[in-house]
Amino acid sequence: MKFPRLIVGLRPVIVAAAIALMAALSNQLGASAETTIEIAPASQQNGAWAGARLGTSPTETVGSAGCAITAVTMMLQYYDINTDPGTFNAWLTANGGYAFDDMLIWNAVTAYSGGRVTFSGWLGPDLGVIEAELDAARPVVAEVQLNGNQHFVLLTGYTLSGGLVINDPWFGDVVSFNARYGDPTIGILSIRTFLVGEPAGLRVDGRVSWLANAISAAQLAR
């Protein structure tokens, strides 16, 4: 006589468990949706700027080592800022936007864009952050290694079949991250994130401030 009562007593627990399971499955499906940002690829080896000296480097050019500024240029173009790697490089050189001759000071992006795009973070290879940024339609600059050398690409989306999608400045193409650099949990060394917003006080008389240079050179440039 007590057995039916036991079953009745368990029903709320079973129903609650079923609801929780359905919610978990729904969250997983939502997290697996595809996100892509259409950004035209650019090549650091384009003849229009490839031969230009990178910053004040005695040896490097935009073509040989301008991957970071080319990745940033593609991002800036996405935000409707009319520029290209050659123009960006010239401005950085004239306005103290490089540390140690040719290493991009990421804060300089804020000054260059007049505050329309602000550098917001130098982070580790956090795929959760990457997905959140892409879901918010904000491309992410990622540090990788190409033939043992430091390289930067622009993360523009992710798909169910191919994983992360990138614009690669060295090759000037759009390609799957996995196809070129392997597992992103290993292949991505660090990321740079950016927001659309107001200036952060990094301009002094039209130049990147010395304080920003000193801090960025020590903390943000390699």
Residue ranges of predicted features:
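Bacterial N-terminal signal peptides that target proteins for export
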Residues: 2-15
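Catalytic cysteine-centered active-site loop
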Residues: 82-128
